[in-house]
Structure formats: structure tokens, C-alpha cells
Amino acid sequence: HGLSLSVPEGKVTSIIGPNGCGKSTTLKALARIWPCYKGNVTFNGEDIKKFSHREFAQKLAILTQAPQSPADLTVKDLVEMGRFPHRNWFGRKSMEDDAHVEWALGQTNMLGMQHRLLNTLSGGERQRAWIAMALAQRPQVLLLDEPTTYLDICHQLEVMQLLEKLNRELQLTVVMAVS
């Protein structure tokens, strides 16, 4: 049951397969959520175990299949959470954090919705908010587990077009699991 996977930098890579084949497990291993007991996972040639949690979170962001949040969280509150790996010891926001949050909201067309509660958004809007949070993290790699599974076809297209735009304009490496 070995796996060898090389992800080209600045490209979109899809891991495709039926339910239960290990797509989510692979993403979680890449993100250090689940440990690799055999073999290793490297990032730019370095074993991912060598990075501190903070360093690794500055390099890689992951969105799971069905992310959860408190009901009273606004879009902006969620996106600000993406800046935690970059904050100082006391967790205070900086002007740089504010700029990255604003940038991420703009990239995902969520600036006009930043004060709305997440639970008032459509499925596609909510997914864009979560992607904005990951972008605020300013990762080199974005892992997405079934990013369009729970969306209707119009919202699926909207999310996929956003990912294509981010990849093209930012050279963001995207790895996604899809059925």
C-alpha cells in the first residue's frame, strides 16, 4: 500500500478516486494531521517533521471536507483566523495582518460580505470564505479535500474558477481530492 506522489510547484494537482480509497488520508498526511508511520513526506526537499507547527502552517493550508465554525462568526472573523501562524507571541493583529485579510477577502470577492455571519451565506459563499481564510495564511500550497462536494453545479463552477484564478495569478500550488 505504498504511495509515491510528487506535486509540481505552481500547478493544480487533483487526486481522483472513489470514496474510501485514501484521498483524504493522503491530504491529511501531507498536512501533518495524520502521521506517516512508514516513509516520509517532504516539502521542498525537507522532511515535514523538521518544521515547527508555526513554520509549517505558514507554508501549507488545508481545508477539510466540511469545515465547522461557531454560528456567530463573521466572514472577516473567520478570515482573520488564517493569520494566526503569523502573529506574535501575544496574538495581537498587526497592520500587515489586516492587509492580508483585506487582500484575501478581495481575491475571493468577499469584501462586501465580510460582516455577514457565516451561517447566513450560501454554500458557495461559505466555501469562498473558507478559501479566503486559507489565503490569508499566505501559504505556498493549498490542500482542498472535496472542495465542491456539497455544492450545486453553479457554486461548484464558481469555486473551481476561483481556484483556477488563484493558481494562474499567484502561482499557488493547489492539491485537491475529488471523487
Model-predicted segments: where are they?
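Helix-to-loop junction immediately C-terminal to a conserved catalytic motif
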Residues: 31
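Catalytic Walker B motif of ABC-type/P-loop ATPase nucleotide-binding domains
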Residues: 142-146
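Conserved catalytic motifs of ABC-family nucleotide-binding domains
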Residues: 138
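Conserved ABC ATPase "signature" region
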Residues: 80, 95-113
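Conserved ABC ATPase signature
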Residues: 117-121, 125
